[in-house]
Amino acid sequence: MLMSSKAQKALIIATPELISVRDADMTVSKLEGLHFDEIYLIINKISVEMVKSGEMMSIDDIINIVAVPLIGAIPDEKSVIHSNNIGKPVVLKTRSRAGMAYANIAKRLTGVKVPILEDEKKRFFRFGRK
């Protein structure tokens, strides 16, 4: 007898650009229609400076549009590009904020309670509010 199984969790990865956020919102609607149990949001390439200057949507703005729980935000930093170019995962760079963000997302996905870092809260959540 063949058993049918479906994924129970879905990760939506969006960048802080309007088209990406709109696509993420549409994808969430489709996944909800398929009765996914858990849908989480990862925001990739977030720039504190651009959020602060009003050039980029804030994390709060994105969460309000997509309306699913945030499981992590990956800062846009040079270490990611450098790691890609030398073929080493950024998660191995323990001092990299992006590496730490990836590691924390992995922990959260496996059920480990990892709070959003205080530094992340200060730098990402505070900026972008008007």
Please state what every model-predicted region is.
Residues 39, 95, 117-120:
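Residue-level detector of alpha-helical recognition elements and their boundaries
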Residues 95-115:
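Histidine-centered active-site loop/cap adjacent to the catalytic His
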Residues 104-108, 117-130:
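A short, charged, Gly/Pro-tolerant segment at domain boundaries
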Residues 84-100:
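C-terminal boundary of histidine-terminating zinc-finger modules
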Residues 1-72, 76, 82:
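Conserved catalytic-core segment of NTP-binding enzymes
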Residues 21, 73, 91, 113-117:
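Secondary-structure transition/capping residues
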